[in-house]
């Protein structure tokens, strides 16, 4: 009988052991879930509209201001300071420490100010009178066409003038063609004579155009002093063209930004200073060739030809004056 009681005691002990372990497991599971929940909360993103700055999620700065210092509590507002009126702005909630620079309406490109820049709104530009642009965001406006035979539709800020066409009879068109032919042919002998004479003078002075194997024309004068032409060259170029050229020819972005910042509302001066800075950096040697060939590579051949004509005519005029002076001195 005592043996039966001993056997029953062993059975109860075996059953009670697993049950007590099961109860312990039930108790520790909630603690494990709580740890996981805390980790998930720490790793979660900030609420919508907030941004993590250091250890806290911060509110954004409102339009017209920029962040000066981070928030010091969860969900708090950072220290924000106003943008500079008329110089920079922000037009939406943001977390940046910088305002955006106001747009400049370039008068040389046919633009004028429609609405001034404020702390919360960028400058709004429009075409000047007698200029138009087809796109909503214009970098430059084109001059309106002037009609010779009447206007069908006037020029507007978004469309060019539509001119009335004059239809002529076959006889009048034929006479007009003969007239144009005469006007074109009459000056040809004089132009040929002048060109031959000029080439002879150049040959006498050892001044010849170099022969090139490629299609790109190399300037006849390689080491012309561009210093006195900088302003005239700048007048022929757009600010975007000047920035693109100097950027590709060694001027760092920080220097470009510095020049733009020093002359914020004077596009003409920005172009002059950018080109002058490049010329000082490059030096006189081959600067003229670099300018002309750089414009051609940028598919601005018409602009390169225009600048080339300005310099070539000036240099040719100086040489002709020098030759004339030498001839006068030899006669005396």
UniProtKB/Swiss-Prot annotation:
TNFR-Cys repeats lie at residues 45-81, 82-125, 126-164. The modification Phosphothreonine is found at residue 212. One of its GO terms (biological process) is necroptotic signaling pathway. Palmitoylated. Palmitoylation by ZDHHC7 prevents the lysosomal degradation of FAS regulating its expression at the plasma membrane. The chain crosses the membrane at residues 176-192. Pfam families: Death (PF00531), TNFR_c6 (PF00020). It is found in: Cell membrane; Membrane raft. Residues 227-251 are annotated as: Interaction with CALM. Residues 17-175 are extracellular. One of its GO terms (molecular function) is calmodulin binding. Glycans are attached at residues 38, 116. Residues 227-311 form the Death domain. A lipid is attached at residue 200 (S-palmitoyl cysteine). This is Tumor necrosis factor receptor superfamily member 6. It comes from Sus scrofa (Pig). The gene is FAS.
């Amino acid at each position: 009988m005592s043996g039966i009681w001993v056997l029953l005691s062993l059975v109860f002990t075996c059953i009670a052991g697993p049950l007590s372990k099961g109860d312990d497991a039930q108790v520790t599971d909630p603690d494990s879930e709580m740890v996981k929940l805390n980790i998930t909360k720490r790793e979660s993103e900030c609420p919508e509209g907030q941004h993590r700055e250091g250890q806290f999620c911060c509110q954004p700065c409102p339009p017209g201001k920029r962040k000066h210092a981070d928030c010091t509590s969860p969900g708090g507002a950072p220290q924000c300071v106003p943008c500079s009126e008329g110089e920079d702005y922000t037009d939406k909630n943001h977390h940046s420490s910088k305002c955006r620079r106001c747009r400049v309406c370039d008068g040389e490109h046919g633009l004028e100010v429609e609405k001034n820049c404020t702390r919360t709104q960028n400058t709004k530009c429009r075409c000047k009178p007698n200029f138009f642009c087809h796109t909503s965001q214009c970098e430059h406006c084109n001059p309106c066409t002037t009609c010779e035979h009447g206007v069908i539709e006037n020029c507007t800020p978004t469309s060019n003038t539509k001119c009335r066409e004059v239809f002529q009879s076959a006889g009048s068109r034929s006479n007009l063609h003969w007239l144009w032919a005469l006007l074109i042919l009459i000056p040809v002998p004089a132009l040929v004579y002048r060109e031959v004479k000029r080439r002879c003078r150049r040959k006498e002075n050892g001044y010849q155009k170099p022969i090139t194997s490629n299609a790109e024309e190399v300037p006849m004068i390689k080491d012309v002093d561009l210093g006195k032409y900088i302003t005239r060259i700048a007048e022929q170029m757009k600010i975007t063209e000047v920035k693109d050229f100097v950027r590709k020819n060694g001027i760092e972005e920080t220097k470009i930004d510095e020049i733009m910042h020093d002359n914020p509302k004077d596009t003409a001066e920005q172009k002059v200073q950018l080109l002058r800075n490049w010329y000082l950096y490059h030096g006189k040697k081959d600067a003229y060739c670099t300018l002309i060939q750089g414009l051609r590579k940028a598919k601005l051949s018409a602009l390169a030809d225009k600048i080339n004509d300005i310099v070539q005519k000036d240099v040719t005029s100086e040489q002709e004056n020098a030759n004339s002076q030498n001839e006068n001195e030899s006669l005396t």
